[in-house]
Regions:
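Extracellular calcium-associated, cysteine-rich motifs in secreted modular proteins
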Residues: 1-170
Length: 170
């Protein structure tokens, strides 16, 4: 029988979503996706149905240039540096670490592509810090493993001589 007895422009609904299969210009309640029960309308004409939870659903039904938001953070994948992480969106220095300090693996130095972490919180990035786990030391000029800061822990008494680091006799 006629599934749309009160609508003379429709009579069949193959996918059972309640929208008719007839696509003619005069048809009302027509289904833009007659073979897909999860989709029926495409407002922006991008080929992705307006139901975001349907098959290849459009999370941005009024923007024909955007449709997918994999992490459901409200930012289209094309505009999201981290399309699979809802806690991060932007990476201004393109180092692979997100700029949101409260997000997953945040970039402590969002404007420096060579730094992203500061484990000891001494304001010197781990890559430039000779002692990334000791906030009292950052540099080791002679490379002997003892820090140059004379007031820091394990201080090098001879920061320019790699063969000496301690002065036990004062």
């Amino acid at each position: 029988g006629d599934l749309f007895s009160n609508n003379p422009t429709q009579w069949a609904d193959r996918d059972g979503d309640g929208y008719g299969d007839n696509q003619s210009e005069t048809a009302t309640m027509s289904d833009a996706f007659s073979a897909d029960g999860t989709q029926w309308n495409d407002t922006d004409g991008d080929g992705h149905g307006d139901n975001p939870y349907g098959t290849q659903g459009d999370w941005f039904p009024n923007d024909a240039t955007r449709w997918q938001d994999s992490d459901r953070d409200g930012v289209a994948d094309e505009d999201d540096a981290f399309p699979n992480d809802s806690s991060q969106i932007i990476d201004l220095d393109n180092d692979g670490y997100g700029d949101d300090a409260n997000g997953t693996d945040p970039d402590v130095f969002p404007n420096d592509p060579t730094e992203w972490a500061d484990t000891d919180d001494d304001k010197v990035g781990n890559n430039a810090d000779a002692f990334p786990f000791d906030p009292s030391q950052q540099n080791d000029s002679d490379g002997d493993g003892f820090g140059d800061n004379e007031r820091g822990s394990g201080a090098d008494k001879f920061p320019n001589d790699s063969t000496q680091w301690s002065d036990i006799d004062g």
